[in-house]
């Protein structure tokens, strides 16, 4: 919600005379939001969406209560115009068993090797306990098209039929 996506889409938004609405429930994020369009401080699942052609859900669903995810996405699809799409990028539940352990360790090692302080990594991981719950593929409605996968992170497209 800092505006990275909006900034990367700025030229396209201008060329297509499109409107961007950034949504996040955190007032802290509102304060650092820096992108074209407007910022709305609201939980994504309770926001009153207007009809749209393209929606982007970036690291959002893992913070939506699991029992509300499918209904939220169905409501988004209802607001999506025919031929439009919702792009989802989120964290998936980790693989089970040792493979899941390896992926988690590789993720933490990657953060550390990128220069993030070990204490900061641990503090962030602990702060997410009870707040972040990764998604499962079964929580996505319809037949999502997977366009990206790296470790526990995946990207999907939900298309609204014409």
Identify the residue ranges that each predicted region occupies.
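Class I SAM-dependent methyltransferase SAM/SAH-binding core
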Residues: 1-47
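C-terminal alpha-helical "lid/dimerization" subdomain adjacent to the S-adenosyl-L-methionine
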Residues: 91-141
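Conserved beta-strand signature within the Rossmann-like core of class I S-adenosyl-L-methionine
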Residues: 83-91
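A conserved beta-strand element that flanks and buttresses the S-adenosyl-L-methionine
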Residues: 56-57
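Core SAM-dependent methyltransferase catalytic element
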Residues: 139-162
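A short, conserved alpha-helix within the catalytic core of class I
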Residues: 64-76
């Amino acid at each position: 919600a800092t505006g990275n996506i909006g900034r990367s889409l700025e030229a396209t938004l201008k060329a297509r005379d499109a409107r961007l609405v950034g949504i996040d429930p955190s007032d802290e994020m509102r304060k650092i939001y820096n992108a074209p369009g407007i910022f709305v401080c609201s939980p994504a699942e309770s926001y009153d969406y207007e009809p749209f052609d393209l929606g982007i859900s970036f690291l959002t669903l893992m913070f939506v209560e699991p029992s509300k995810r499918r209904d939220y996405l169905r409501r988004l699809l209802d607001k999506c115009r025919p031929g439009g799409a919702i792009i989802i990028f989120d964290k998936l539940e980790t693989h089970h068993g040792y493979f899941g352990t390896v992926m988690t360790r590789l993720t933490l090692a990657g953060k550390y090797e990128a220069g993030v302080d070990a204490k900061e990594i641990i503090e962030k991981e602990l702060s997410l306990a009870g707040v972040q719950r990764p998604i499962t593929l079964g929580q996505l409605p319809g037949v999502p098209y997977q366009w990206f996968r790296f470790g526990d992170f995946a990207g999907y497209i939900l298309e609204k039929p014409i």
